[in-house]
Amino acid sequence: MDKLIITGGNRLDGEIRISGAKNSALPILAATLLADTPVTVCNLPHLHDITTMIELFGRMGVQPIIDEKLNVEVDASSIKTLVAPYELVKTMRASILVLGPMLARFGEAEVALPGGCAIGSRPVDLHIRGLEAMGAQIEVEGGYIKAKAPVGGLHGGQFFFDTVSVTGTENLMMAAALANGRTVLQNAAREPEVVDLANCLNAMGANVQGAGSDTIVIDGVKRLGGARYDVLPDRIETGTYLVAAAATGGRVKLKDTDPTILEAVLQKLEEAGAHINTGNNWIELDMKGNRPKAVNIRTAPYPAFPTDMQAQFISMNAVAEGTGAVIETVFENRFMHVYEMNRMGAQILVEGNTAIVTGVPRLKGAPVMATDLRASASLVIAGLVAEGDTLIDRIYHIDRGYECIEEKLQLLGAKIRRVPG
């Protein structure tokens, strides 16, 4: 199993390009199953989860074509099986996203219950109840969701999400695109990745309105066709590199990103003392060599502060001036990285869903273990601001969400290298 070795103490300084958003790319790839002619998806990040989704398509008889720029063309007309098997789904929770498209287009689907990061319960009941509201018959048995559409296909319906669910919103939006009549999704997720999926569906000929608000209206159409679509930039990757620069007192310019979908994070970085400039597709952060100030964070669904940036801000607070409280309201059990950081000399106290972080001048390098995707990014940041060497184990978590993380950090002057397991 690969490991990362980081020798801390360098301020980050330089420019890098931001990759396409994994959390946008995966639902958009799933949406290609709705089209009866080829769809080309561009600006895909080179990540394990993307490879897994492409491998899943291959198992189903769909053979995507990948060009020299790593754009992927999907022609779902060759599909042979409507089963998403456990051995692939167990490694990637987003596999559940093929359920809605397969059910809407082909009338049935069988998808294994998903795996993914171990950060609390993420029930799929919202997906199931939403599809049932559109007429689907669904059974869960043997670890699989087995779904059938009624004769004549899914019909429009009204569905209220008891809790905001990004993948639930995306799955029902895709299913509704080919359903008969109008579907109204209330208390829908407002994330930029949901908007990106809606834009892609509309480019394929769908009629989706209201994405980005909490009420999405989808008028079903008879067919969806081919399109060429660019995935939006990854706001969490963007935020991670900004926080890494802030924690080290450095300066970075991030290109091919979108500052308008990161406002809550940028506001907190300015509170921490960062000087931030933005353009249409770039963000520049400069700490001017200063130590960050501790900030208070409360996670909540978009447009509030994202749960996927919580761990990185704990790392910054760990070496900041003062004390900051971080309240996690989206997922339970999402402070597992804290115990690893405390082994590096951080002063973090967890009480229920709150972490109280008292900054220290510098952490100390130590062997640590990644527990999930964003926790692993926070340990990388901790390693960058620590004295001596930090060895991070189980970095397959990082590879699920960050494209070429060690190469990008090396471009910014970090001393980081990958050691094969």
From Swiss-Prot:
Active site: C117
Residues bearing PTM 2-(S-cysteinyl)pyruvic acid O-phosphothioketal: C117
EC numbers, comma separated: 2.5.1.7
Pathway membership: Cell wall biogenesis; peptidoglycan biosynthesis
SUPFAM superfamilies documented for this protein: EPT/RTPC-like (SSF55205)
GO cellular component term of the entry, any: cytoplasm
Positions contributing to UDP-N-acetyl-alpha-D-glucosamine binding: R93, R122, P123, V124, D125, L126, D308, V330
Keyword Nucleotidyltransferase belongs to the record: no
Enzyme class: transferase
CDD domains in UniProt: UdpNAET
Biological processes per GO annotation: cell division; cell wall organization; peptidoglycan biosynthetic process; regulation of cell shape; UDP-N-acetylgalactosamine biosynthetic process
Keywords: Cell cycle, Cell division, Cell shape, Cell wall biogenesis/degradation, Cytoplasm, Peptidoglycan synthesis, Pyruvate, Transferase
Database matches in Pfam families: EPSP_synthase (PF00275)
Location(s), subcellular: Cytoplasm
Statement: the UniProt record of this protein carries the keyword Nucleus: no
GO molecular function: UDP-N-acetylglucosamine 1-carboxyvinyltransferase activity
Catalysed reactions listed for this entry: phosphoenolpyruvate + UDP-N-acetyl-alpha-D-glucosamine = UDP-N-acetyl-3-O-(1-carboxyvinyl)-alpha-D-glucosamine + phosphate
Residues the record lists as binding phosphoenolpyruvate: K22, N23
Biological function: Cell wall formation. Adds enolpyruvyl to UDP-N-acetylglucosamine.
Family of this protein: Belongs to the EPSP synthase family. MurA subfamily.
NCBIfam families per record: murA, PRK09369.1
Name this polypeptide is given: UDP-N-acetylglucosamine 1-carboxyvinyltransferase
